[in-house]
Amino acid sequence: MADFTAEVFQNEVLAANADVVDAVVTVTAAGGASAGPRKGDAVAVIVIDTSGSMAGDRGRKIVAARNATQAAIDTIDDGVLFAVVSGTQQARIVYPDEVGLVRADDTTRVEARAAVSRVQAKGGTAIGSWLLAVARLLEGAPDALAHAILLTDGKNESESDENLQAAIDYCVGRFQCDARGLGTDWEVDELRRVASALLGTVDIVPDPDDLEAEFEELTRTAMGRESKVALRMWTPKGSTVEFVRQVSPTLEDLTGMAESVNALTSDYPLGAWSGDESRDYHVRIRIPTGNVGDERLAARVMLDIDGDEQPPSLVR
């Protein structure tokens, strides 16, 4: 299991009458999956758009989606729970035959590949229903480290924007999702909203021929993740966290994702991590003004790793 550290970088001297403390928190994981076994179950769900538009480009897109999904299935580690979802104006479980998850082994991979080979492209696009299908699959493994790949080539035209947002909100904290848009006709903002809220990535796959390698890499990365991490912020009475934003390697605002631990403490979920990762977070604390020469603790920053709280770092 990876070893985690959190370092705080800041200017500890404030101007007179200042009421804001800014700090950069660098969270680093080192050691990687080879350092120990993953705690608990892992889940991989592959969600592919099978709407009518996927039959375009003389069928290249749906063929590429089938091939990429089969490649991802082959990349899933033995013992990992998995499922495949087909998305149109509603979600359909492609594999397994009954709603639920199955463990990856030689037999289930062959069965899943066969089921995926029969997928056809027809229907509309309702991404929110696809996300909710993933959430339902995870009801049988609520504590698992869950990851989904979501692929679409078009816009969310078969449900309202309000329904999509409600589905995204429902899925926050339940699983991590990497979203990919195939071609150039998909809506960037829609997939960015999904990926940002679900602590994943969003990117374009311009050519169907590139999709198989993309799915393999996404799945391989997910298989290396082993820990759920949260940035735990404690502030003394009278001080408040104004924002928490990831600033490297990508830009993400985590402020609205805060989960209350108690009256003075909140957790900001950072998603699942593998070894040898480093991410930077800009935190801003609003404090009462003080007198020149006063020393004050603005916050304690801790990491919560799979439910285990680590020793704190101080924001002064």
PLM regions: where:
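Short beta-strand elements
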Residues: 310-316
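Low-complexity, acidic Ser/Thr/Pro/Gly-rich terminal tails and inter-domain linkers that flank the onset
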Residues: 1-16, 24-26, 231-242
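Beta-strand elements of well-folded, non-transmembrane domains
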Residues: 10-12, 27-31, 50-52, 235-237, ...
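Exposed acidic/Ser/Thr-rich ligand/metal-binding surfaces
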Residues: 7, 17-230, 290
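Acidic, polar loop-rich interaction surfaces within structured domains
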Residues: 169-176, 187-302
